[in-house]
Amino acid sequence: SVGFKAGVKDYKLTYYTPDYETKDTDILAAFRVTPQPGVPPEEAGAAVAAESSTGTWTTVWTDGLTSLDRYKGRCYGIEPVPGEESQFIAYVAYPLDLFEEGSVTNMFTSIVGNVFGFKALRALRLEDLRIPTAYVKTFQGPPHGIQVERDKLNKYGRPLLGCTIKPKLGLSAKNYGRAVYECLRGGLDFTKDDENVNSQPFMRWRDRFLFCAEALYKAQAETGEIKGHYLNATAGTCEEMMKRAIFARELGVPIVMHDYLTGGFTANTSLAHYCRDNGLLLHIHRAMHAVIDRQKNHGIHFRVLAKALRMSGGDHIHSGTVVGKLEGERDITLGFVDLLRDDFIEKDRSRGIYFTQDWVSLPGVLPVASGGIHVWHMPALTEIFGDDSVLQFGGGTLGHPWGNAPGAVANRVALEACVQARNEGRDLAVEGNEIIREATKWSPELAAACEVWKEIKFEFQAVDTI
């Protein structure tokens, strides 16, 4: 029998290996698989492993020139999803050699590049990834991380406060700078470019950078605190993005910003390297994430996108609020918040964490809570997110009836009151409203804010839990 055995064969013969013992160097993936009717789970799980590693639909002559056993992905476990008839979790192990070092782009191209359009599957969702320590070590990660950021800003023992400047489109650069100054003067640590503020006809990036830098130096001089404004460097080309980051550094500002999903991982990693080399903090916005992560049965869970960002690099990332206007289930959100901040995270399925993850001292990322939050949420946010977080109130600052600076004062007073109460041992979950009410006696600005937002609620069930 000369030649090789041509023809199509079942994936599960080669790629379903329930006895496989995973290696410490393997990248492990947990997929939520919904096969087409009539496709057995083992075949669907094996198909995912094959299509995202070495496999193709038929045996090929060149298979004989390589060691499949060394390079193939393996589906090593399958478990049903409780309460879902046609879904199950497929665990796949990928050998480390399949991936380029230090490239989040290549990791995603390999693992999720092709397989999501596969006909034998009705739907597919990547729920979690275990990044082996050997692979983590090929990434620089966040430019600075939580501790270095606190040291640079000289702010300890409390969450940081931010605010997105609104209206997000249409202000001139000078008026935009005015809004920044008022917020920072009132007591915020940071203000933020909206994610879609790049360089539009009504406000070119260079003008905005200049006026925002002026605003933050003025506010710094007045308050004696270090201030920052996230200057959005996101652009149409990598070269233009770097040009903006370089200009920000020349102005001496502390932090720039990037939209990492629309800008892309390659651009983001370049920017993160530049930021570490030049002492800039990097704020990351997750615009477009819901396109990828909102469906329960198809796409990629945000915890995977968050892990990828920690590898690619960013010092802050938006991560939902649990209490505001956007998605976020408490336990699940706290699961990926810990994945961003902590060095070692134990497997915990109740929090959606499928694998134990060791980050081997890669710097941590500050989670940013923003979206429909206001002073009444402060106790809950302080309790849920703890000190290592950035709380961002856009409308919750600028919507204050007396203006931006009093809005900033109200948020700062509310935050300081919550932190003090917590440090005195009071239970924020139980006494939160009372703590805010007490603080209004000392702050007319806070009293006015409490009056405006006392009835606001965003009560809808989270979509990805329905």
UniProtKB/Swiss-Prot annotation:
Residues bearing PTM N6,N6,N6-trimethyllysine: K5
Cofactor remark: Binds 1 Mg(2+) ion per subunit.
Gene Ontology biological-process annotations: photorespiration; reductive pentose-phosphate cycle
Record-listed substrate binding positions: N114, T164, K168, R286, H318, S370
PTM note: The disulfide bond which can form in the large chain dimeric partners within the hexadecamer appears to be associated with oxidative stress and protein turnover.
Protein origin, superkingdom: Eukaryota
Chain positions found as N6-carboxylysine: K192
Annotated keywords: Calvin cycle, Carbon dioxide fixation, Chloroplast, Disulfide bond, Lyase, Magnesium, Metal-binding, Methylation, Monooxygenase, Oxidoreductase, Photorespiration, Photosynthesis, Plastid
CDD domains per the UniProt record, alphabetical: RuBisCO_large_I
Binding site for Mg(2+): K192, D194, E195
Catalytic activity: 2 (2R)-3-phosphoglycerate + 2 H(+) = D-ribulose 1,5-bisphosphate + CO2 + H2O; D-ribulose 1,5-bisphosphate + O2 = 2-phosphoglycolate + (2R)-3-phosphoglycerate + 2 H(+)
EC class (word): lyase
Site (Transition state stabilizer): K325
GO cellular component: chloroplast
Gene3D superfamilies: Ribulose bisphosphate carboxylase, large subunit, C-terminal domain, RuBisCO large subunit, N-terminal domain
UniProt entry tagged with the keyword DNA damage: no
Subcellular location: Plastid, Chloroplast
Entry's Gene Ontology molecular function annotations: magnesium ion binding; monooxygenase activity; ribulose-bisphosphate carboxylase activity
Active site (catalytic residues): K166, H285
Subunit structure: Heterohexadecamer of 8 large chains and 8 small chains; disulfide-linked. The disulfide link is formed within the large subunit homodimers.
NCBIfam families, sorted: PRK04208.1 (NF003252)
Miscellaneous comment in the UniProt entry for this protein: The basic functional RuBisCO is composed of a large chain homodimer in a 'head-to-tail' conformation. In form I RuBisCO this homodimer is arranged in a barrel-like tetramer with the small subunits forming a tetrameric 'cap' on each end of the 'barrel'.
Chain's role: RuBisCO catalyzes two reactions: the carboxylation of D-ribulose 1,5-bisphosphate, the primary event in carbon dioxide fixation, as well as the oxidative fragmentation of the pentose substrate in the photorespiration process. Both reactions occur simultaneously and in competition at the same active site.
PANTHER family in the record: RIBULOSE BISPHOSPHATE CARBOXYLASE (PTHR42704), RIBULOSE BISPHOSPHATE CARBOXYLASE LARGE CHAIN (PTHR42704:SF15)
Family: Belongs to the RuBisCO large chain family. Type I subfamily.
Protein name: Ribulose bisphosphate carboxylase large chain
Protein species of origin: Eremothamnus marlothianus
Gene: rbcL
